[in-house]
Design a protein with these regions (language model features):
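Conserved ABC ATPase "signature" region
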Residues: 92, 96, 147-165
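Q-loop/switch helix immediately C-terminal to the Walker
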Residues: 127-139
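Conserved ABC ATPase signature
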Residues: 170-174, 178
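Hydrophobic anchor residue at the start of the ABC signature
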Residues: 184, 212
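A short, proline-enriched helix->beta-strand linker immediately N-terminal to the Walker B motif
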Residues: 189-193
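ABC ATPase NBD coupling module
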Residues: 33-36, 96-113, 139
Length: 231
């Protein structure tokens, strides 16, 4: 049975992520009756949304309905390419980010994170847990001090229910639920303001799903993180 929850956000608080009149179309070349034609697939049709600090938006729909495309577009993981048409506007806080180049967008990347569906495929098997989390701290936050990085990793591992003493181990040494905790920790070690949760429990057993959902709720409460939850 669904449980009633207290709201963690202020309805009159600051806007974190805003999308206005978003349209996303993928153009694919197909061959019909010996001729090349362009097939246009409208994945997202005129969507607008506005999320406050600490708010959660759930997006539910069948496979192929554009849920992930919408979420990844807000994170600038789907960009305008030769076969992709994107229109509309995206704001992060008061900054208009939809027209930024990759280089201009880089300062925003650590504040906007994603937790993927499959904890087995989303982690690099060649990196230890420490290296997986350290990567973002070095690349996104440019933290050069090793002790500072280690302190952040130990803190977030404790927060997600992982033993810091296991940080030298590799993903294959953990269960599915533990791997998803690692993936969540990888995002939250950067202290993001907005996280896209792309079916984060669908690959897990039912008993583990509840534990992960409880963890995500607690992290949201602690950090006032804004979520889009795709299911």
């Amino acid at each position: 049975e669904p449980e009633e929850r207290d709201l963690f956000y202020d309805k009159n608080g600051k806007n974190i992520i805003t999308g206005k009149d978003l349209n996303i179309t993928f153009n694919t070349k197909v061959r019909v009756a010996g001729r090349n034609k362009t097939l246009s697939i409208n994945a997202v049709n005129n969507i607008s949304l506005n999320l406050k600090e600490g708010e959660t938006l759930g997006i539910v729909g069948e496979s192929g309905s554009g849920k992930t495309t919408l979420g990844q577009t807000l994170l600038r993981l789907v960009d305008r390419e030769s076969n992709t048409e994107i229109s509309g506007h995206i704001n992060f806080f008061d900054d208009k980010i939809d027209q930024l180049t990759r280089r201009q967008f880089k300062p925003f990347r650590n504040q906007m994170q994603i937790v993927f569906q499959d904890p087995y495929a989303s982690l690099n098997p060649r990196l230890s847990v420490k290296q997986i989390m350290e990567e973002g701290l070095i690349v996104a936050q440019n933290i050069k001090n090793k002790k500072e990085r280690l302190d952040k990793i130990e803190t977030i591992m404790n927060e997600v229910g992982l033993e810091p003493s296991s940080m030298q181990r590799f993903p294959h040494e953990f269960s599915g639920g533990q791997r998803q905790r690692i993936a969540i920790a990888r995002s939250f070690v950067l202290n993001p303001k907005f996280v896209l949760l792309d079916e984060p429990t669908s690959a897990l057993d039912l008993s583990i799903q509840k534990q992960i959902l409880e963890l995500l709720l607690q992290l949201q409460k602690n950090h006032k993180t804004t979520y889009i939850f795709i299911s």
